[in-house]
Amino acid sequence: MKTLLFAILPLVSLYFILLVEDGRADPYYRKFTTPKQKALILGNSKAGQGIMPSILNNSLKQIYDLKIYNYSFTLFGSPYGPLYLESVKKKLEEGIKGSYFIITVDSWSISGPIENPNNISIFEENKLFLADVKLVDIDPNPFYFASHYNKSFYEILIQKIKPGKTKLHDDGWWETEDYLDSATILSRKNNMVRFYNDYNERHSFSEVRFNYLREIILLLKERGDVFLIRMPLSDEILEIENEAIQEFNKLLDGLASETGVQYKDFNENKTSFFFEDGLHLDTKSSIFFSNDLAKWISDFKSETDYKFN
């Protein structure tokens, strides 16, 4: 009996520790414990940090009577491909109609390893969490913690007692600490420039990923409005992205026309945004951008309603 008790006690303790994780100990875990959703934001970390569902929900509540959830991850974790498609399917509620979806795209989210960019078996995400997390709406979620939680479990308790400055919110938005020191910001930007120059040398456009992007668009279009967007970048990082896929906007304009959805590049006539590292918007700019995005969607819906009335 004592042996059984000692065997069960650690599991029970772990169960309750996982229940108190509130988004501060890990940037992705809570995305796999929240319920299935009616509306989603898709993309990588730019979208994860830069688009605030709370602002969209408030600004668009007269148009869409539902809440949108940020289901964006990372450059390597959620490029468009079979794993992201299947995870999105799992995260969607059944029978959704009259919803809306925001799909963020950049050159890197539709690129693959340069040796064979269309070979699914060598896609980087095969070794990351989307490959292992079979259920995306259970709390606690052992599929994620078994393979992809790399910190001590005590970190969960520490963050609960003394919270840090980063947090994954209940709506999927990843809040980060704003770096105000100019030297730190410059250093981070230089690191990003080096990283993405190197990334471009090792990756190229993937027709397979592009086709999966199309498949995701068509999947979501059956459930509501789809808005395809290119998020703003600093001039330095944007120049590198433009080198990755030339005539990117022409490619996306064609896809939007083919699938019957709206596309906008927010780098065109962009207002003055502040980037933590050249890539990710800081909190204040995330607020500004989310409002800009909401206005664009609202204006489109108003124009569409006017045409049909």
Task: Describe the function of each predicted region.
Residues K2-L19:
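Hydrophobic membrane-insertion alpha-helices, especially the h-region
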Residues E21-A39:
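Alpha-helical transmembrane signal-anchor/signal-peptide segments
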Residues Q37-P53, T283:
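Catalytic nucleophile-elbow at a beta strand-turn-alpha helix junction centered on a G-D-S/GDSL motif
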Residues K46-I138:
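Membrane-embedded segments
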Residues N118-I216, E222-R223:
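Secreted/periplasmic serine-hydrolase-like ester/acetyl group-modifying domain
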Residues Y179, I216-E241:
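Active-site segments of SGNH/GDSL-like serine hydrolases
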Residues E241-N309:
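C-terminal regions of proteins
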